[in-house]
């Protein structure tokens, strides 16, 4: 059927900020879909609140609205734009839920807007647990016995009839939020109570646990002519019971017989046909390893994390084709863009194995609950491609960037057998490494399979890896063993370790004996047809398929898996850099390991290498491609850390040179540079041990800020008030960098702001100054930032511009740099300089209309700012006010304290823009899901040093009609200043403490600050946790609460008697 001509204008809803469970895969899907619709000649209107994505770039859609994805704003845009149709299936759960809400409120009918792709009835049938159950019964597809409950008592009664363990799944939540496995009634009560609160329709499904079955996924496509196909099946290494987003996954599935595959394939296709889904869909199934019994677990009627993985694993562009199907095209009339000759009706065939391993945030959250279950906890993932399981698994391990280069963590050798087996049985994020250690200790695959329900096939592969380790150890320098190890994915570094030599010597030995990788193409058809995709992976075998072109090339290093502190913003800069390289006439090559992102879409660059970002893997590509140089400044800390070893190996680093990168990162060199340039910084010293640190702090005076050098995202950074806290920090945190010293700085409480600058070595362009709403001490990634600045005097802004120019020229910066300042009493101090693209690049690029990463790349390749038409100095500021606000994923991470401090905790960001500060703030709060009703109660529980300031806020809340509650000390302070607050107990006051008030819905906001003491109060932590779990707005910085007040005051009227 040809495409529809009765619709011209289509609105696409994006997925909003990045949170755990909904990450960059939707940026990738949404970007693909918008471009695919434009390609067919439709006018595309996009709504998304996330500035950090490629999707919200002007050229992706005809009109881009960076506005909150809420009923109020989406309706407003629908009325203004009047589209013919709405495509909600590419915006993750956010897009789907928004479509449901628009429909339920009658907006779609009123405006005559048609839903494309998946009908509402199908979304309902797949998402509503009751309707799903009915449909499966009609199709005679088996599902675990289950019951829908709306109260805790109903859940307990049903569990009594089927027996424990049971699984709780709240309806309409994302990434398993609020769900979990319950072994007994106590756990069931706790999880169901929380689940009912988090479900927008207050319902949960209680089902028999099928933990221990194999978890298999099918990624399927269907069009309006009822053509349907399987793009790819995937098998979880971990059995059912661990969220698929937190599982190691292999594609294609490895342990199923042909009969089982056909059985599950037929089930998946019959489900997508019954739901009449037009587009992509993901079916999750559980297969009994001991019989042909299976259950359908769930269906996602939309593009999902798994479809991004399936797209990258097969090269089959699901989102692009889903968009074409949504406008009426069928699979037998669309050409598969990979081969350029076959139709999209051909099911992909793979002649390689893909491994995906999730990336968890527990290196940032040491206190976090690491046990894995049905609720997702990973922030990102890596993918690796190989010719066998061993190769793809080991390549994926070294892609993770958690300090391992093999499937082993050396410290585990010291763990006792009992502790080891406990970690093997109770899965945590690092279970793979414990299982591998158990095999090294001689536990058999049979024993481990019995304990873990992991298929013995995979455990045999881990055993094979261990056998190769023993071979290597027994035969140093043996070329045959070396070849075997390389065929199975071993890194040079691991081989060097076993041989007691250096990585470099192993590399030399390989090169001398021509043991080098070949690069194979990902072509969707197992090389049956000719293919034109320049998408490659390395393996040690025959016939290299990646042919070097005659054109001069530039290699750009990506930023690897998404984690806290290094998010999609760096991918954004990478993609823009590639555009500029191509515009300058070079061939652009990307190397990256993250399957979720736009940079690993093969249509972005001239060549894509899907490889780990390690020195060895990068050098192999450089040896083959011989690029003009490598650009490292857009790949975050991942790429910057590779600059030095690459330069030592004789590779040309384009942009700021390694010696200058060092001057910005190395404390003593940096201090030296600032002295020479006559720029003040807070007084500080370096220390290599506890005594030195104590001495330094006495000299500088408390409070001090302590942190290791060379880290991203403020890892292990703390503000300490006294010597005892400092000593305890030195004992617990210095692990963070054994051969790097710790920095001890005077902690200045002042106004913080940051600048991104672009320099060509002579001139410096400063697109804008961003002012932080939270005072110094909150990590810049967790602060709300405002552009243009609202409170900085002209003099301060001029000083900032002057210091920025001096630093850029003085540090010989070529390309991007980011500088953070703190201002106290009109005096400007430099806190830190990062000689690379920072996480504010996409935000600032969008609000100033300067494509910063592209400009920086052009300068790196030799053009000057004046040639590109930019002035030296501060760019004229915008007339509108723009705010970047952080978004957190605390609901997913039990036991992580939500108190903001110098260590970064946010996973994503949103933007709010309007004519005034108050309106922009309102949008930013709405977009980041911080919604305050116009009346209700606010609780204050405040540290002594901030009571004075809090009193002023409480008065303002009272003036606009809020009730004020406060804990004992705070209430007494308020009363002594003439403000009566209703006293409320902290913790353990039966039903009069804050958590129980929160549970009863009597509190609308909590304002809680703590002193800077290291023994942060346990009570405070429980109060903050209860706010997070019940979705009550929580402010741990008074500045944020003050910003919220500005919004409320601007939206309310004051009523006073005359």
Swiss-Prot record:
Allosteric domain, as annotated region: 930-1058
Residues binding Mn(2+) 3 are 820, 832
Pfam hit, one: MGS
Instruction: Please give a single GO biological process term from the UniProt record.
Output: 'de novo' UMP biosynthetic process
Q: Where are the transmembrane segments?
A: none
Binding, Mg(2+) 3: 820, 832
According to the record, cofactor stoichiometry and binding are noted as: Binds 4 Mg(2+) or Mn(2+) ions per subunit.
- SUPFAM superfamilies (UniProt xref): Carbamoyl phosphate synthetase, large subunit connection domain, Glutathione synthetase ATP-binding domain-like, Methylglyoxal synthase-like, PreATP-grasp domain
Binding locations of Mg(2+) 1: 284, 298
Location of the MGS-like domain: 930-1058
Q: Where does Mn(2+) 1 bind?
A: 284, 298
Has keyword Transit peptide?
no
The kind of enzyme this is, by top-level EC class, is: ligase
**What EC number(s) would the UniProt record show?**
6.3.4.16, 6.3.5.5
Region named Carbamoyl phosphate synthetic domain: 547-929
Q: Does the keyword Manganese apply?
A: yes
The UniProt family comment states: Belongs to the CarB family.
Q: What is this protein called?
A: Carbamoyl phosphate synthase large chain
- Species of provenance: Streptococcus pneumoniae (strain 70585)
The protein's gene is named carB
